């Protein structure tokens, strides 16, 4: 039994084929080098071979610096068969090699000139002559993919099964490079399809590994018919190779019953074809093998104590494959290999955090232990999956496992455990995790310095700091001056000892900001990159502050037109981010990160949590970034890799907040608000004050299904249409029942535009008036749904019946007449105010 932790990712045959590939690449390079002739020399040679007089006067001892004789040059520079005959009659030997090791016949074959090939052979050239690498002219034809040249050589007696220095026949080479026509020619002349190369590899092995389906069919169906169960020196059959490299069409073809392929055969490492498909995340191939051949391979363990399920967990990047395997009756999520390790151990060891979370959510037991098979039988070194993750420095997984930990009476205790009976583990970062983090961050900074355009490089001495205007976990934000501009300076604290370091966040934000250029996105001025202690991001200063401050701290009252201008600007900024060549997902869109100019226009800011959508860092799209209160359900639940549609959800909450002047779910803490939206499908109430065209946009925007949400291009179009018809967008015109006139509502509010409680009083009056005017509509609606309401209820009684606070901590009145809110309470009897 082998040690799982020492399982090689490459086999011996892989290493050999790598060297073979390199050797053929060198051969092609040397052939091409022989064709490289200086321009002036080439023109002179073209003149020689184009004029009988010039040809007759040339010296037979002529040589280029690469050792090409006139006979070689005749094959390269446009000579003809008469030149070949004349030169050979004058005594030039066709066997003479260039400095790169090739005779004239090899060059004629590489140039694909059947006429010159025939002339050379008729004039005495040896068809079996070997050049560099043990290659004959037929090998060269197979490498270059020239079927006519190959046929001429074979007609003149070339050995179809001749082997080169690595024991490859021309058929091996044609199968390796995918030259279908050359393969057909070789088979027509009787090539042996079952001859073995240096490591026992046959043409069918090579074509199966490379995915050349038509060549596989030729080898199996024509000529002497290839052995579909032939094994190489490591006992691989063709099915192993096509399963490993994901060639589904070849797998399906080989599994045909009439071919009698053995689907459960193992190699010297104990791997079945299903193992190799799972080790490489080839879901469709694995599915085909299981569905066609049954479950026998599912229970087989290789020498590293891994079943196919373990193998899929080792790969770890295809959760659909893992789900499929778990759906099979023969697979148990907690199955332990001979050394005791489970699929969860494998996922932890290789750092697949998304898969680890999936396995834990589906019943994987993190307390099962594995034993080190390299230890003597008298010693025990039991290790949980947490220890495996800690050993490899996967600190994020260690933290996740601690969160899921279920205490038991006895847990293994070793160097990774704290003394004591609780089995608690040492805190992260692990030693290796710390080294990984520091190394990665240094590399990220160096790469950023190299890639950031010089105009964005700033020195800290260029920046003049004024007052503090904000702060966060990263550090502080200052107002200041840089290059004669008033700017905002985001000063980072360097901290390399946390799983989500400030250095990493800084590098990501700068790499995104430097690529943005749009009037609705905050403008990037530059960054200080010299030293982590001086890291700073400089952007334009937006004097109006944040939308959150405007609505909830200053308690400013905006008319509908002003609100729509802000909404359109933010939507345009987000549309720009999502439509870039490399789309950017903001991941933290909320009213804090919407900044306002003095003229009422808005920009999107703060890209500390943003990511390029094509990022390969697999855990980027599974963490919970940003503010929970504005977070999309799929982000909060971490159940899937979310997309740009998560930004649409956050935007919809911001739009509702802008229109109502309320914080979403102000009566709940942020985590409770996110949980209600994710698990109970609760949404903020869409009251009478929100025009119908916008309310329909809100409902689509915070759809629980991301695919049901609109693109920002559609949002911009709808809101611009509303803005053009703002007079018709008032609450009065969007509801057919009794309503406020546009002037009576807005004039009342604007006339009480003083600071403090006058705003709150105005809002209270507004909602009370809306309640009174809309009572008849509510009574009619309640009767239609079977609810008998008392038309004489007071506003206070209505508030009590809906369990909704009249005034929140910011002094805002929640809309008691929201039909959506009332309906959601009736549909969900378990909903409780968790304030």
Swiss-Prot record:
Coiled coil start-end: 21-50
Any matching Pfam family: Ank_2
Post-translational modification: Autophosphorylated.
Catalytic activity: L-seryl-[protein] + ATP = O-phospho-L-seryl-[protein] + ADP + H(+); L-threonyl-[protein] + ATP = O-phospho-L-threonyl-[protein] + ADP + H(+)
Stated family: Belongs to the protein kinase superfamily. TKL Ser/Thr protein kinase family. MAP kinase kinase kinase subfamily.
A Gene Ontology BP annotation from the UniProt entry: regulation of heart rate
Swiss-Prot/TrEMBL cofactor(s): Mg(2+)
PROSITE patterns xref list: ANK_REP_REGION (PS50297), ANK_REPEAT (PS50088), PROTEIN_KINASE_ATP (PS00107), PROTEIN_KINASE_DOM (PS50011)
Protein species of origin: Rattus norvegicus
Name of the protein in its database record: Serine/threonine-protein kinase TNNI3K
Record: active site: 588
Keyword line: ANK repeat, ATP-binding, Coiled coil, Cytoplasm, Kinase, Lipoprotein, Magnesium, Metal-binding, Myristate, Nucleotide-binding, Nucleus, Phosphoprotein, Repeat, Serine/threonine-protein kinase, Transferase
Binding site for ATP: 469-477, 490
Subunit structure comment from the entry: Interacts with TNNI3, ACTC, ACTA1, MYBPC3, AIP, FABP3 and HADHB.
């Amino acid at each position: 039994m082998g040690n799982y932790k020492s399982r090689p990712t490459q086999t011996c045959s892989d290493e050999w084929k790598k060297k073979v590939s390199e050797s053929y690449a060198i051969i092609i390079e040397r052939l091409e080098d022989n064709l490289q002739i200086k321009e002036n020399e080439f023109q002179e040679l073209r003149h020689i071979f184009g004029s009988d007089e010039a040809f007759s006067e040339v010296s037979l001892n002529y040589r280029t610096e690469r050792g090409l004789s006139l006979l070689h040059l005749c094959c390269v520079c446009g000579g003809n068969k008469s030149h070949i005959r004349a030169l050979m009659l004058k005594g030039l030997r066709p066997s003479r090699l260039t400095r790169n090791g090739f005779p004239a016949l090899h060059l004629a074959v590489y140039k694909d000139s059947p006429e010159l090939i025939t002339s050379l052979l008729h004039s005495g050239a040896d068809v079996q002559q070997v050049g560099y690498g043990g290659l004959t002219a037929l090998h060269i034809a197979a490498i270059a993919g020239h079927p006519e040249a190959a046929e001429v050589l074979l007609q003149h007696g070339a050995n179809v099964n001749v082997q080169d220095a690595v024991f490859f026949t021309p058929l091996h080479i044609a199968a390796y490079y995918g030259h279908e026509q050359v393969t057909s020619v070789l088979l027509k002349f009787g090539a042996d399809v079952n001859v073995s190369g240096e490591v026992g590899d046959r043409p069918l092995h090579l074509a199966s590994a490379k995915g050349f389906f038509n060549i596989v069919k030729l080898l199996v169906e024509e000529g002497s018919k290839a052995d579909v169960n032939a094994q190489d020196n490591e006992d691989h059959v063709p099915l192993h190779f096509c399963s490993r490299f994901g060639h589904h069409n070849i797998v399906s073809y080989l599994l045909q019953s009439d071919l009698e392929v053995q689907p459960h055969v193992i190699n010297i490492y104990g791997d079945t074809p299903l193992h190799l498909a799972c080790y490489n995340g080839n879901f469709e191939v694995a599915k085909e093998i299981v569905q066609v051949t049954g479950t026998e391979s599912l229970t087989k363990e290789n020498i590293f104590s891994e079943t196919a399920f373990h193998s899929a967990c080792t790969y770890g990047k295809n959760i659909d494959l893992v789900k499929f395997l778990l759906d099979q009756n023969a697979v148990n999520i907690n199955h332990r290999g001979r050394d005791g390790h489970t699929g969860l151990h494998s996922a932890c060891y290789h750092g697949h955090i998304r898969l680890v979370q999936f396995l834990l959510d589906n019943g994987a037991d993190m307390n099962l232990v594995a034993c080190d098979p390299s230890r003597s039988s008298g010693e025990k070194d039991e290790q949980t999956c947490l220890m495996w993750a800690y050993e490899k420095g996967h600190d994020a997984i260690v933290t996740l496992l601690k969160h899921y930990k279920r205490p038991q009476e006895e847990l293994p205790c070793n160097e990774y455990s704290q003394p004591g009976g609780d089995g608690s583990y040492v805190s992260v970062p692990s030693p290796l995790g710390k080294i990984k983090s520091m190394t990665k961050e240094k590399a990220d900074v160096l790469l950023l310095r190299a890639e950031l355009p010089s105009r964005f490089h700033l020195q800290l001495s260029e920046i003049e700091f004024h007052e503090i205007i904000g702060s966060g976990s990263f550090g502080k934000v200052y107002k200041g001056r840089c290059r004669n501009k008033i700017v905002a300076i985001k000063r980072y604290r360097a901290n390399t000892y946390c799983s989500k370091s400030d250095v990493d966040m800084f590098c990501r934000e700068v790499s995104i900001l430097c690529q943005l250029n749009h009037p609705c996105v905050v403008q990037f001025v530059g960054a200080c990159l010299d030293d982590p202690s001086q890291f700073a991001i400089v952007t334009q200063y937006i004097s109006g502050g944040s939308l959150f401050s405007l609505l909830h701290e200053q308690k400013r009252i905006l008319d509908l037109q002003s609100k729509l201008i802000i909404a359109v600007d933010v939507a345009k900024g987000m549309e720009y981010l999502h439509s870039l060549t490399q789309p950017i997902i903001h991941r933290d869109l909320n009213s804090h990160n919407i900044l306002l100019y003095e003229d009422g226009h808005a920009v999107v800011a703060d890209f500390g949590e943003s990511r390029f959508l094509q990022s390969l860092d697999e855990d980027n799209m599974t963490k919970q970034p940003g503010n929970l209160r504005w977070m999309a359900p799929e982000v909060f639940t971490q159940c899937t890799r979310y997309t740009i549609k998560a930004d649409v959800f956050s935007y919809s909450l911001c739009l509702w907040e802008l229109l109502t002047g309320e914080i979403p779910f102000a009566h709940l803490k942020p985590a409770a608000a996110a949980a209600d939206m994710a698990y109970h499908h609760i949404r903020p109430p869409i009251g009478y004050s929100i025009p119908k065209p916008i309310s329909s946009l809100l409902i689509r925007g915070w759809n629980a299904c991301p695919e049901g949400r609109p693109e920002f291009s559609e949002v911009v179009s709808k809101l611009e249409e509303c803005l053009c018809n703002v007079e018709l967008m008032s609450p009065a015109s969007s509801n057919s029942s009794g309503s406020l006139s546009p002037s009576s509502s807005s004039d009342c509010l604007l006339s009480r535009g003083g600071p403090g409680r006058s705003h709150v009083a105005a809002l209270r009056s507004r909602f009370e008036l809306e309640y009174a005017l809309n009572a008849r509509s509510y009574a009619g609606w309640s009767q239609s749904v079977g609810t008998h309401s008392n038309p004489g209820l007071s506003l206070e009684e209505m508030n009590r019946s809906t369990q909704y606070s009249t005034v929140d901590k910011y002094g805002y009145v929640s809309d008691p007449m929201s039909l959506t809110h009332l309906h959601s309470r009736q549909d969900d009897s378990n909903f409780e105010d968790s304030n």
